[in-house]
């Protein structure tokens, strides 16, 4: 059975948004957080869709601990599993576990330099949504990518989590759904902490 929420994270450029959109095709996922204002397209990709939680965004992570209903305000329809997306979750894993013990945490890992390069290719600081201005410049972005990746790797190790490629079989094993993954990237790994 799917949880009410999955706290979903990856560094900028990890291609986590494509993984999120694939997961949200699983029956039972709530995508009513999608609006025209919460969409960014680049190249031939659908880019970013739905609410993104983060510093300087519509939904800042700090508010979540004082008012968990703040999360659910991003969705216009009740019910279903909500994919709660933020680049900032690596700083908050322990708080998430305490505040939302029945929800899951999903991590998307891509090596620092590959993620940094793809983020720039996708638009870098010109990306309109989500807002990356709090990263200030490319040096800070690279530092934050490396820091967040290390936090994710450390957390996964602490939880004895297993990293896998994002494949059709992985989705079936973890979500019980037959969803086709059209492209498997050899430098992108995922893990799910239930």
Question: Language-model features: where?
Answer:
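Compositionally biased amphipathic helical and low-complexity segments enriched in hydrophobic
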Residues: 65, 154, 190-193
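Structured mid-to-C-terminal alpha-helical surface segments
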Residues: 177, 186-192
